[in-house]
Amino acid sequence: MAELGHQVAVLDIDEGKVASLRDGNVPFYEKGMDESLNRHLREDNLRFSTELAEAIPGADFVFLCVPSQSAPDGSVDLRALRSAAEAIGPHLSPGAIVINKSTVPVGSTRTVHDLIGRDDIAVASNPEFLREGTALDDFMHPDRVVIGAETESQQQRVAELYQSLNAAFVLTDPATAELIKYVCNAYLATRLSFINDVAELCEGVGGDATDVMRAMGLDKRIGPHFLQPGPGWGGSCFPKDTTALTSIAQAVGTDFQLLQEVVDSNQRQFDRVADRARSMVDNVNGSRVAVWGLAFKAGTDDTRDSPALEVIRRLLSAGITVIGYDPKASFAADGFTQVDSEQAAAIDADLLIVLTEWPDFSTIDPSTIDASMRVPQVFDTRRVLDLDHWQAAGFTCEAIGQVAPNPDSSSTVDR
């Protein structure tokens, strides 16, 4: 919002986080965020506070951007949203619009309005569609801006906040706006699960998933996005949003079996990847596996519901020692050691697995890796390596969506 020229006050209950942001330090990794934060601090149009009385009074718009995690039963835990709504109510200026950015179930806009308890305050839904790793660019160049409010005048007031953006605007009612975010994420998860199942089919029939997906992507009805097979999907949104949408459907008596199968397919993908990795090491108990990538995707340090960690946990449960590297993310577990380079992870390893698609991994010279490994073999679950190059360097290579090579023709170098 500061990038769009607005005066912004940010409120958070975490004193340490607020202090860090005041000092110009972003407490997480996001491309471009450090520069943007410090520029707006210098321009004095962005400030941070832990006090309601400092941040809320006088604001024309108040955004609620609180966590919305899954409850044990699969529904959305609304405690943070409820607490925030109750807290801000007495401090809101007459005529202000409260805008919910959090991904929350249908009906939450009405819930927030009821908790605020004031007829002179409007509440709107304005879901975010930011991707970790490209969040700033996504905000400034959105595909669409979705605004759900009870009246056209409220919709227009919120839309004016984004008037400098070149984007399509979807002005609708709150319930529809709330549903849009869930449906979008559920569809993307569905697409990924489908592609991973197709990749397994390719392995079974001897096809190559890369060519299949490329041909699919050239079809204008399908397009090229979200057609890359991998170790599964995860992150801060897809798992909780697919679960939440299933819960929402059940609450209104809608049979959404397809979405449940999407979730189940993803769990099977974690198992398939781990099982294939285990089959590539001679002695499961006591083997040593190197892992490149811990974050749920490249461009972030976020490991929430990371497919990489799902696979790592399965390997650890099988008694395999795992040595991991990631340029931004970190992880800790019994039997797991994190090191500070790709080469360090590969030392004495029986297998190298690529689990996150960091671009730097594709530039690694395999000749700097093979001599240090106990068994030079690689399993590329993200299809980021030039496997012909790695094979020429003496590696046995396998990849998601590609039939495993015949052991008799393997290029493995005996050690």
State each model region's role.
Residues 1-415:
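Structural/interface elements that position substrates and couple domains in central-metabolism enzymes
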